[in-house]
Amino acid sequence: MLKYFFILFFLIFTAHSNASNKNKIIENLKNTNNLDFNFEQNVNGKIENGNCTIEYPKKIFCEYAKSSNKILVSNGKSLIIKTLTSYYRYPLNKTPLNFILDKNFLINKVKVLEERIVDGSLINYTIKENDIEINIFFDKETHDLIGWQNTDIYQNFNITFLSSIRKNRIISKNIFELPAQN
């Protein structure tokens, strides 16, 4: 009988813990209007890093370090990747960032998806939408978004980790203006 009590207690505790994580992540997302952070991105083994600013919904500006002045910008509709020698424009809604940059979408997914604890410190949700699979990671202590993993539009495996996250800062709105073509 005691064995069944412990099993029941463990199941209730685990369910409460999962619900608590979900609620804290959802509340954190609801209270976040923008964030800036450093990032490290691994695309098929090629590592790049830099700094990004996200403004919900669907706006992002990233400057890459040590790379021919590479920037990534979304105004909420289009996504531009620009270097000194190249300029690529994509409809945002055809990229995984369309989902990652939409906090209401993330909130709705977190509500219904099963969480997975990774290494005791990360909370992971796997989102499958429109033939796109994205693993979203949140910090178990702060409940901040701290990364994602997906396959990009070129079928490259992409892992992005965030650090030095700052939320709800005053940001210049013009950083999300799309840059002119080279």
Predicted regions and their residues:
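Sec-dependent N-terminal signal peptides
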Residues: 4-13
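Boundary at the C-terminal end of the N-terminal hydrophobic targeting segment
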Residues: 15-19
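A short, Trp-centered hydrophobic/proline-enriched beta-strand micro-motif
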Residues: 27-47
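Short, solvent-exposed coil/turn segments at beta-strand boundaries
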Residues: 31, 53-59, 74-78, 120, ...
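A generic structural motif
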Residues: 40-42, 63-65, 82-84, 128, ...
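An acidic-aromatic
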Residues: 52-101, 158
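Flexible, surface-exposed loop/linker segments and immediately adjacent secondary-structure boundaries
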Residues: 84-122, 127
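Gly/Pro-enriched, hydrophobic low-complexity segments
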Residues: 109-110, 114-182
